[in-house]
Design a protein with these regions (language model features):
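ABC ATPase nucleotide-binding domains
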Residues: 112-113, 117-136
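Catalytic Walker B motif of ABC-type/P-loop ATPase nucleotide-binding domains
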Residues: 45-48
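H-loop/switch region of ABC-family ATPase nucleotide-binding domains
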Residues: 80-81
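H-loop (His-switch) and adjacent beta-strand-loop-beta switch element
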Residues: 93-105
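Conserved ABC ATPase signature
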Residues: 20-24, 28
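Conserved ABC ATPase "signature" region
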Residues: 1-16
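Helix N-cap at the start of a conserved alpha-helix in ABC-type nucleotide-binding domains
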Residues: 56-58
Length: 136
C-alpha cells in the first residue's frame, strides 16, 4: 500500500486515490497507469500512445513526469505518431515501417531520406516543400 501511495504522489494523483477508475479523465488515467508501473518498481515503461485523447495540460504534465523518470534512470519506450512534437519530447527515436528504418538521436534520424523510407513519398515531398516538420 505504501508503494502505491508513493507512486500516486509522484504522478500527482494522491487526491484521486479513492476515485473509481471510470471517474478519471484521459490524462488522469494515463498518470494512474504510470503510477501502477512505478508501484511495481519497473525499470522500463512501455507506453502506447500515452498522449492520445488527452488535453494539452495533461500532455504537458505527463511529458514532464516522463522526463523526470528518465533523469532518475528509468528507461521509457513510447509509441508516438505526432511528428511535430518528436524533437521536443524525445532523446532517441526509432522509425519503423515493417522493419527498423533508422535509430538514433532525433537529428540523426529525422532526415528526408529516412522519413521517405518510413512514411512514403508523400511525406518526402511535403518535407522538401517545407511543410510541417523540422526534418533535415
Amino acid at each position: 500500500k505504501d508503494l502505491a501511495l508513493k507512486a500516486l504522489e509522484k504522478v500527482g494523483m494522491v487526491a484521486f486515490k479513492d476515485r473509481h477508475i471510470s471517474e478519471l479523465s484521459g490524462g488522469q488515467l494515463q498518470r494512474v497507469f504510470i503510477a501502477r508501473a512505478l508501484a511495481q518498481e519497473a525499470e522500463w515503461l512501455l507506453l502506447d500512445e500515452p498522449f492520445a485523447g488527452i488535453d494539452a495540460t495533461s500532455e504537458k504534465i505527463i511529458i514532464e513526469l516522463l522526463k523526470q523518470l528518465r533523469d532518475e534512470g528509468k528507461s521509457i519506450v513510447i509509441v508516438h505518431h505526432d511528428l511535430h512534437k518528436v524533437q521536443s519530447y524525445f532523446d532517441d527515436i526509432v522509425l519503423i515501417n515493417k522493419e527498423v528504418v533508422a535509430f538514433g538521436t532525433v537529428s540523426e534520424v529525422f532526415t528526408a531520406n529516412n522519413m521517405g523510407r518510413a512514411y512514403g513519398e508523400a511525406i518526402s515531398e511535403m518535407i522538401s516543400l517545407g511543410g510541417g516538420t523540422n526534418v533535415k
